[in-house]
Amino acid sequence: MGKTYSSPINPIPKAPKGLAIHHWLNFLQAAYRLQPGPSEFDFHQLRKFLKLAIKTPVWLNPINYSVLAGLIPKNYPGRVHEIVAILIQETPAREAPPSAPLAEDPQKPPPYPEQAQEASQCLPILHPHGAPAAHRPWQMKDLQAIKQEVSSSAPGSPQFMQTIRLAVQQFDPTAKDLHDLLQYLCSSLVASLHHQQLETLIAQAETQGITGYNPLAGPLRIQANNPNQQGLRKEYQNLWLSAFSALPGNTKDPTWAAILQGPEEPFGSFVERLNVALDNGLPEGTPKDPILRSLAYSNANKECQKLLQARGQTNSPLGEMLRACQTWTPRDKNKILMVQPKKTPPPNQPCFRCGQVGHWSRDCKQPRPPPGPCPVCQDPTHWKRDCPQLKTDTRDSEDLLLDLPCEAPNVRERKNLLRGGGLASPRTILPLIPLSQQKQPTLHIQVSFSNTPPVSVQALLDTGADITVLPACLCPPDSNLQDTTVLGAGGPSTNKFKILPCPVHIHLPFRRQPVTLTACLIDINNQWTILGRDALQQCQSSLYLADQPSKVLPVLAPKLIGLEHLPPPPEVSQFPLNPERLQALTDLVSRALEAKHIEPYQGPGNNPIFPVKKPNGKWRFIHDLRATNSVTRDLASPSPGPPDLTSLPQGLPHLRTIDLTDAFFQIPLPTIFQPYFAFTLPQPNNYGPGTRYSWRVLPQGFKNSPTLFEQQLSHILTPVRKTFPNSLIIQYMDDILLASPAPGELAALTDKVTNALTKEGLPLSPEKTQATPGPIHFLGQVISQDCITYETLPSINVKSTWSLAELQSMLGELQWVSKGTPVLRSSLHQLYLALRGHRDPRDTIKLTSIQVQALRTIQKALTLNCRSRLVNQLPILALIMLRPTGTTAVLFQTKQKWPLVWLHTPHPATSLRPWGQLLANAVIILDKYSLQHYGQVCKSFHHNISNQALTYYLHTSDQSSVAILLQHSHRFHNLGAQPSGPWRSLLQMPQIFQNIDVLRPPFTISPVVINHAPCLFSDGSASKAAFIIWDRQVIHQQVLSLPSTCSAQAGELFGLLAGLQKSQPWVALNIFLDSKFLIGHLRRMALGAFPGPSTQCELHTQLLPLLQGKTVYVHHVRSHTLLQDPISRLNEATDALMLAPLLPLDPTTLHQLTHCNPYALRNHGATASEAHAIVQACHTCKVINPQGRLPQGYIRRGHAPNDIWQGDVTHLQYKRYKYCLLVWVDTYSGAVSVSCRRKETGSDCVASLLVAISILGKPQNINTDNGAAYLSQEFQQFCNSLAIKHSTHIPYNPTSSGLVERTNGILKTLISKYLLDNHHLPLETAVSKSLWTINHLNVLPSCQKTRWQLHQAQPLPPVPEDTLPPHTSPKWYYYKIPGLTNSRWSGPVQSLKEAAGAALIPVGGSYLWIPWRLLKRGICPRPESSAAVDPKTRDHQLHG
């Protein structure tokens, strides 16, 4: 079941939110009574169920556990049923509360009578995480329930996404179900936007590849509708959910001014979101508290605003506002299960609003009339909020139209802030103050005081100033200025500013009414006029920084370059350069500066630069951008790679190429990304600081530059492609090829493309333009009238000795020309084998004779390297040649001299490669390549597999490739039906028709059990292997020891091989294995497969001779099922042969492990003498053996478990650290609970008491010392909340708690023994072993029971009141009163009671506990007839 919480040092599971601590403790105590103990999964399911149950109306105080049990769904995971059943047994039944009386006011409509709920209901419980999902279509009630849950949330909000994600997890919907759900939940506009985003995400996912997706079976949406395609359906569901987060408006978080408190959001959570948003949104140095206090009231919901208004705390400190609103929680507004109200007849009286009969006034649709005339215009027909005089005059509001979008992205990294209740801020147009990037933010305003005309002045806008600042020249002469201290950027100032406590009127250009301030600061030096945040907030204005993009080139700047997440700019130092390189670099930088490719720059970031000399003697500028590339995100390229030029139809004979000059330098770079492309030009000999520059255009060396340029060039050429549909424009990077059917159309196309490129600022290079007639060199290939060849072919020297670098370089050149080289994969495979095991470039490789022959074959094939251009009217055919070394495929067309392409595919790196799977993969690869490059699929496939082998594979195989082969079976032809063509002789090569041995099945697999054959069971591990041969009885069994370097997989193979060797006399055999790997391996071998590389190649090759010609039945057996059928029992017997028997602990081993007492050893099989001898022989017990013990004394013991506890804190030194052990012991049973802490505080004491309660139960009384932690207010409040009575020991005597002190000694002794046995034992483990020994192993000699058995026993019987206490002889003591400095002894007096640490002495008419250190034994005072006192009874001191 998992890890249980029986260990006392494990933390208590945290209570669900909204559940009282005493209720949670009841559930914990019930859970700990389960047998076996509860697991983490049980607590997880209990918390999950309680979170949902809290939201239902049956959650009352006290809880009705019987009703709560009815809410648990059938087959609910975990053991929640058992926990609630225990609580039902322990809790007495309660009477139902009386119903509420009806309303007596005749003016009010009667309330809705509550209908009795027939059956308990609860909110729907979805599948837990990890439960298997079962698909079922939506029902109307399901859609209604989902819509009700998301009715108060916006699409894309966290609440909306959480509900939708759980619904998808529960129902496992198909693509059609998700479409229906979207149409039901969202508006048509949101559904349209979601559809666009979903199509974009699906296109990106299809290009990246999806597991199980077949491009030929239709779009992903069609394939996801199949309920059996669970993997594709899961991919579609994730894309469908991701489309919500990409909706416009959901990608940007709300600013701090737009964060609203949700209708069900706690006020504290709302204030926390505001605080985070202000930390991210306010400029540095801006005071946050005034804005936070203002928004905490203005953006709160109606309930919290009413509370603050009623208490007059709308502008109070934030702490008072939090305390005022802490009584309002969303529990008051939780959703409940609605009961259908009883229909009441409509009233006979007319409605006082509309005057009509038939409805109550509360249901009237007529708007409520105003209570009186409008206080503004005295019009009785409208409310004040609708008064026309309060409408904003828009005649002079040109600035309201300046809300233009900024093209530059925001620099600040935003954090995801939760929207309160899924609400969005209202769309209100605030006054905008346009600012400039080059100048300070200023505004022309007019300032006036009482009875003074307004004065025009230019003010500086400062959102960091709490209060407005005005110069002293504007202040009236008779103003009453007061001294004040101002805290600014330069520190506190006391003599520069005065405060004016009178109203100030500020007239703003975009506001008709002036802004009135109650006070402002006066600058006595007449230097500053600052419009502070008090004025800006009152006028509800918004500062707007207009973006002024610099126009560098006609080409638009890219929107995304991969650095939008704004990582820290790289700082790579510039390395030194010699004078020649430095001079060349200076010239190159000067040219780039003149061309306006770079500009001077002062800012962070640096990447090194250096020049490289070309073969013609010129220098090339290189910027090392590897550091920037490492933090740049890859962009999805619009093209999958270079095009296959054989797709250029022969019907387009007229060609022309266009070359672009410095193409990358034509795309402007946004200024926000300049730190990532900055560099430093050093001074000679470091005579001064270097000159800083940064790129203005897209530089070469940036990894996303090719992709960005392709996007820009494709945007320019798209309109031209639509204008000339009969022509082709092939674009790859900065290379462009034009193809047209006629010369006139080619000329027109060339002019159109040239004009479009020149208009966008992309310069052309006319001297590099090529045109037909004649060959065209493009992308390293030569385009002729009917064929495609490569410009250069590798020259191969047939020799036997190669260096690693030479062989790698030659194979790389062969890889480039392999699409046109007529050679099989086997020749290339031999050369790839020669590279294995070599890593040093200086290694010398000696080729074998077979590899040298492969070189000759490739050298001859290179002379025939040529490919045909596509003929649109002819179909495309494919040839597949499967070989043990790899697959060779050819695409060709009939009646053509050369094929279209040669494709070589290596086999996967697995131990067995089924040829059926390889054939299916080749079909998919060829169809995909043909569809991608030629726009059509292959008409037929010619392969080297016989029809007999293919038919047998389709009938007997259970591989997934069978469905693919059956789907394309109508296009299969073996090599007997050869296509026509001049290169037909190639198909008749002997090596193609060579028989493949692995295609012939070496043995036969029977679909059913063979009755007359014996059964073989085998298994293996890393150290042993075993097998059993059974035929009505065990015929043979054997265990094999394996080498130390053997793996578990090899051990299983060893066991099977040994069993097959013993089974040679039988022609048929039943094989039962618990290894899925071996079962699949045998089935693949029976169908035919190519062997692959494996660490157990030798073992795999031994299987074929042992199985040759046999008929076998293979069956997979699940291990460790404990079933009683013969197959499971024989498999368990095979496993048992490799395992040693599990023996119980003997008394000696038990004592070595736990150091328990002799009585515990006697309970585990040892005699009294043996137990005594074991303890005496233990070395650890001899070294650590406590001498002496404290006297028993008298303590207050409980008469039942959990009646009275004693608690104490003892200290333990462990590895240079001092730990506190918080010990709780039950005075009745002696059961102990311990918590290990680093501190001794009130919180630690509360936590330790919670741990003890969860294990031992809740006590009625606890007794501790008078330490500060136990007397803290937090601990006292916790005890009072659980109704636990707390008392302390005797004052001034910390040793008076005898039981817990003795327990401390026993605990420390055991821990010391465990640490002596193992110095590296963790302290938590030592504490757990000690508790196990004390509570469950050690036997108390007085009752012959363990402490835990005594803790579970019945309470002691009550003592009759007439029972007299035993008579004891009186004892007399001299004493000193604790706390007094008097050194004289008082007494003697007679003690009333004695305990382990003190005695109860009558002092001055009362009784005090006096510790032993302040007591001295005395004798009875001499009576009047005194006799000689016995000298033996003289005073003496006794220490307890």
From Swiss-Prot:
Site (Cleavage): 123-124, 337-338, 430-431, 553-554, 561-562, 1145-1146
Residues involved in Mg(2+) 2 binding: 1019, 1052, 1074, 1135
Residues annotated to bind DNA: 1371-1420
RNase H type-1 domain residues: 1010-1143
Sequence segments annotated as region (Disordered): 95-116
Key words, A-Z: Aspartyl protease, Capsid protein, DNA integration, DNA recombination, DNA-binding, Endonuclease, Eukaryotic host gene expression shutoff by virus, Eukaryotic host translation shutoff by virus, Host gene expression shutoff by virus, Host-virus interaction, Hydrolase, Lipoprotein, Magnesium, Metal-binding, Multifunctional enzyme, Myristate, Nuclease, Nucleotidyltransferase, Protease, Repeat, RNA-directed DNA polymerase, Transferase, Viral genome integration, Viral nucleoprotein, Virion, Virus entry into host cell, Zinc, Zinc-finger
Annotated catalytic residues: 462 (for protease activity)
Reactions accelerated catalytically: Endonucleolytic cleavage to 5'-phosphomonoester; DNA(n) + a 2'-deoxyribonucleoside 5'-triphosphate = DNA(n+1) + diphosphate
Domain Peptidase A2 per the UniProt entry, residue ranges: 457-535
Cofactor details (free text): Binds 2 magnesium ions for reverse transcriptase polymerase activity.
Reverse transcriptase domain segment(s): 593-783
Binding residue positions for Mg(2+) 3: 1208, 1265
InterPro entries recorded: Aspartic_peptidase_AS, D_retro_matrix, DNA/RNA_pol_sf, Gag_p24_C, Integrase_C_retrovir, Integrase_cat-core, Integrase_Zn-bd_dom_N, Peptidase_A2_cat
EC number from the UniProt entry: 3.4.23.-, 2.7.7.49, 2.7.7.7, 3.1.26.4
PTM comment: Specific enzymatic cleavages by the viral protease yield mature proteins. The polyprotein is cleaved during and after budding, this process is termed maturation. The protease is autoproteolytically processed at its N- and C-termini.
Residue interval(s) of motif PPXY motif: 109-112
GO CC annotations, alphabetized: viral nucleocapsid
Domain remarks: Late-budding domains (L domains) are short sequence motifs essential for viral particle release. They can occur individually or in close proximity within structural proteins. They interacts with sorting cellular proteins of the multivesicular body (MVB) pathway. Most of these proteins are class E vacuolar protein sorting factors belonging to ESCRT-I, ESCRT-II or ESCRT-III complexes.
Function in brief: Matrix protein p19 targets Gag, Gag-Pro and Gag-Pro-Pol polyproteins to the plasma membrane via a multipartite membrane binding signal, that includes its myristoylated N-terminus. Also mediates nuclear localization of the preintegration complex.
Protein name: Gag-Pro-Pol polyprotein
Protein's organism: Human T-cell leukemia virus 3 (strain 2026ND) (HTLV-3)
Upper classification of the organism: Viruses, Riboviria, Pararnavirae, Artverviricota, Revtraviricetes
Underlying gene: gag-pro-pol
